[in-house]
Amino acid sequence: MRSVPNYHHSFFIFLILILFLAFSVSPNTLSATESLTISSNKTIISPSQIFELGFFNPASSSRWYLGIWYKIIPIRTYVWVANRDNPLSSSNGTLKISGNNLVIFDQSDRPVWSTNITGGDVRSPVAAELLDNGNFLLRDSNNRLLWQSFDFPTDTLLAEMKLGWDQKTGFNRILRSWKTTDDPSSGEFSTKLETSEFPEFYICSKESILYRSGPWNGMRFSSVPGTIQVDYMVYNFTASKEEVTYSYRINKTNLYSRLYLNSAGLLQRLTWFETTQSWKQLWYSPKDLCDNYKVCGNFGYCDSNSLPNCYCIKGFKPVNEQAWDLRDGSAGCMRKTRLSCDGRDGFTRLKRMKLPDTTATIVDREIGLKVCKERCLEDCNCTAFANADIRNGGSGCVIWTREILDMRNYAKGGQDLYVRLAAAELEDKRIKNEKIIGSSIGVSILLLLSFVIFHFWKRKQKRSITIQTPNVDQVRSQDSLINDVVVSRRGYTSKEKKSEYLELPLLELEALATATNNFSNDNKLGQGGFGIVYKGRLLDGKEIAVKRLSKMSSQGTDEFMNEVRLIAKLQHINLVRLLGCCVDKGEKMLIYEYLENLSLDSHLFDQTRSSNLNWQKRFDIINGIARGLLYLHQDSRCRIIHRDLKASNVLLDKNMTPKISDFGMARIFGREETEANTRRVVGTYGYMSPEYAMDGIFSMKSDVFSFGVLLLEIISGKRNKGFYNSNRDLNLLGFVWRHWKEGNELEIVDPINIDSLSSKFPTHEILRCIQIGLLCVQERAEDRPVMSSVMVMLGSETTAIPQPKRPGFCIGRSPLEADSSSSTQRDDECTVNQITLSVIDAR
């Protein structure tokens, strides 16, 4: 009799086998017998599926890396890369455990990266595990930690991750930026914690310090806005014999926030917003001129809320008076009177300060300010002192023993700093107070006497005087405009009808004539609609650019007023710096910092010079212009619309850092103001937005349009005014749009970019820039992004970019543009500031 198979028994055995396999190999671990290969597309996922580890190749690169990214977030965001400086050259790569180490092998079975653990029992089995906080661990069979990725950060600090020093081993955990947004290899920027008596963070470019966080004051790093206390974020700073580290913890579930050093050197706090499905920038550093390291030199401090930005501490004077007058405070300040160190020295208190660089400090956390002051007076090297901890009214003592530098004053926040002064400087203060009291009594008597005399004179008046007031619509002469700007030899400038004084040095006409070789043609740098720009050299050797306004231009005087009023208020690394002005003998001149590499258009559209603009330089220029425009629109004290952004108005310094210039057509907007209307359209055709050129409506989105045109010009090396098809009906915008629609947009890229990159051609990065440029030049203003969004898109390859709509002014040439082409000026200089348009739709 034939037996019947026991299907139930077979199924039971099969089920047991499946369960055994499921539990024996966890998806968040890698055992000694397992491996990850690129070809298998296998990854390791953390228990709650927050993070994922695996191989990736950025954009269209052929290089492969082992990395960790957010799995729970739809936008691919990398937080750690293992072999960032040793990528796999092909898709044949393997991660496995070899001995006590994690090792990546290439196609020839050669190791390209390893955890490099030495010693230990190689016979003890080890396993790797990915945790929900993003940490990748290697443990032995006794659960002893052998290695963790948190000790080797790349460009991102996650929650529970430590940044700083392990004092026992001397190992320093630092953040280092990607080289570019598409290249994970080590970039030039780093963020690291320097150990001193009073530790603080630096952002460095190679070995040069760019930014200093200020020391930990018990609650936060004194100049880092991101350490403001919020209920869901807990910050921790530890300074002990074992470690000097900074970390943070998130108390709210399903909240993802990271500290990120981008490829442009900005340290950003980014938080994921589920509602918008995007990373939002909560803060970044460095942000303004005063964040730049030691911008005001020794014994000088910076104040971004006033002008000039650099000031000497009371009792000090500038080392270089002329450079100081020209707003270059880097030489710093020196004492007016030397310290006596005989017990008679005293202190001046500076409020709301970022404490100075702490490289040379002595810290005692057990004493208060009174004893701290006494110790400072006992030490002839002591230059200043302050509380070490601001909590509970302040405690502890920190003493500076060398020149103090890199200070700034805040409108809110900061802490008190006590700077040592000679007794003579303190005596001057006492004498001044006595003089003030005596003068007040004398002035009161004088005012009373003056009132009596004035009253008597008024009664003697026999006739009234009629003052003729000119019509406000009359064109004012150039001489009358001198009264609009009050400039004294002490360097104070005020706007008409306002009591606001702006520090602006006044230079003599004779001095400028000497500096420019009597305005020689050999010194001529360029010519615009309002005058000529000359190169000059002052007696101290400082090079300057002198903009001499044309006497024949009625609008040149308006431009002069506008430029003085606006640029004097602006301080940013990507904006040209106004050093002074000249109002003398009917002449009006503006004095700027001299920028060695002249304007962007002189490089971009010149066949010889353009060869020096490889893609990395062009990308840096794009980012710099975007940062400058973002500052104008969002971060400056007054919102400013430039209205004439173009290649010839972007200047380049010796390091090819771009600086936006020419603010003669700019307008100030209120914080709640979104757009304005004008009957006098000014700007340059080819860069003007449709709504501005046709209807006189301008806004921040008008500048965004100009930026988009400029971005596409930088990528293509072509002017927007040319025609780029056989029918001569497509300008640059139409040319790029057609190639975008056809899917062959890389054909618009300047061949120099391709030649300079060879095998490292960052296709994905360039495509992103083209797409961002098209977003900026969309026909409808409401469709264009704001500059803060542009910066995020430029700085992160993981940010989703919308599909662009049709650009404005992409086909043909307008009649007005045709008319303007008859000018004898070059196309890029042919502005429409001499044209007045009638706008029917008044708003």
Curated annotation (Swiss-Prot):
> Residues bearing Phosphothreonine?
T678
Reaction equation(s) it catalyzes: L-seryl-[protein] + ATP = O-phospho-L-seryl-[protein] + ADP + H(+); L-threonyl-[protein] + ATP = O-phospho-L-threonyl-[protein] + ADP + H(+)
Q: Where are the transmembrane segments?
A: 436-456
- Which named protein is this? Receptor-like serine/threonine-protein kinase SD1-7
Where in the cell? Answer: Cell membrane
Q: Which organism is it from?
A: Arabidopsis thaliana
Induction description? By wounding and Xanthomonas campestris pv. campestris.
Pfam families named in the record:
B_lectin (PF01453), DUF3403 (PF11883), DUF3660 (PF12398), PAN_2 (PF08276), PK_Tyr_Ser-Thr (PF07714), S_locus_glycop (PF00954)
Q: Which family does it belong to?
A: Belongs to the protein kinase superfamily. Ser/Thr protein kinase family.
